[in-house]
Amino acid sequence: MVMLTVAFISFMLFQYVGDPVTNLLGQDATPEQRTQLRADLGLDASFPVQFVRFVGNAVQGEFGLSLRQGRKVSALIAERFPATLELSLSAAVIALVVGIPLGVYAALRRGSFGSQLMMTVSLLGVSLPTFLIGILLILIFAVTFKVLPSFGRGETVNLGSWSTGFLTLDGWKHLVLPAVTLSVFQLALIMRLVRAEMLEVLRADYIKFARARGLPNRAVYFGHALKNTLVPVITITGLQLGSLIAFAIITETVFQWPGMGLLFIQAVQFADIPVMAAYLCLIALIFVLINLAVDLLYFAVDPRLRLEKPAGGH
C-alpha cells in the first residue's frame, strides 16, 4: 500500500515538471511531430491509463524507457545503484565508528573542555548545509593541498553486473571526500544521541547497583551502560541509512558522483518522468525494507521485547 501510494503521488506530481516532448524535439518542431512523438512515448493516453501501465510494468521490475537516453530505466538504475550504495554505506560506517566513541567520551567527560568543544562542533555539523561542507572540503583537500580528487568515482572493478570502487586505490581516494561530506550530519546526530542516552542510562538504578557491587568503571560503562545506550542508536542509524541513500542527491551533485541521485537530478532537468518515478519508488522500497530490518534487529537486541508475553498468555 505504501509503495502504491508513493507511486501514485510521484507519478501525479511529475506530470507538471515539464514537457519531455519539447525537450526531445526543441521549440521548432511542428505540431505533427509533437503529436507523433507523444503517441510513440505513450504520453497521449490519459493519466489513469499511464499510471496503470506504469504500475503493471513496475511489478515486473520494468519502468519503461528513459525519455532522455532511450534506454531501459531498470538498466540505468542498476548501473548507478552500486555507486550510491557504496557511498551511503561508507558514510554510515564513518558516522558510527566516529560518532559512537565521541558520544561516549562527551558523556563520560561531561563539562570538560573536550566535551564542550565536541558539542559545539556537532552543532555545526547538524546546522551546516551538505553542499557547503562539500565545497569547503573540496577547497581544502582538492584545491589547496591537492591530496584528494574532487569529482567522479575513480577507477572501478566489475564483479559481474556489479561495479565497485572498493577494490582500487583510486576508487578509495575518490570516495573519501563525498563519504565524509555525507556522513557529517549523521555523525553529529549519532554523537549527540549517544551522549544524551549515555547520560540517562548512567543515572539508572541498575548502574548504581553495579557500582555498589564494586565493578570497575570500564565494566560499568562499556558492559552495561553502553550496551543499553545502543538500542535506540540502532533504530536511528537504520532509519538514517535510508535517508543517506535518499538524500545523497546533493552530495552526488557536488562531487559529480555517478549514482542514482545524480541520475535523478539529470532526469528532473529533462522532465524524464519514468526515471524520476522509478527513483522515488525504489527509495520508498528501500525505506520499507530498512524499517522492517530495524524492527527485527531491535527485537533481537532488546531482551525486554523477547521477554514480553502477549496479553492473556500464561
What are these regions (language model features)?
Residues 2-52, 145-167:
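Hydrophobic alpha-helical transmembrane segments of membrane transport/permease proteins
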Residues 9-17, 45, 56, 121-152, ...:
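Membrane-water interface segments at the C-terminal ends of transmembrane alpha-helices
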Residues 46, 50, 54, 72, ...:
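Amphipathic alpha-helical recognition patches that constitute DNA-binding helices
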Residues 23, 46, 76, 115, ...:
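Alpha-helical transmembrane segments and their helix-entry boundary regions
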Residues 44-100:
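An internal, D/E-rich "acidic patch" concept
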Residues 30-62, 207, 256-267:
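Short hydrophobic, aromatic-rich alpha-helical segments embedded in or entering the lipid bilayer
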Residues 27-42, 119-133, 177-183, 219-236:
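Hydrophobic alpha-helical transmembrane segments
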Residues 4, 81-114, 143, 158-314:
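Alpha-helical transmembrane segments of integral membrane proteins
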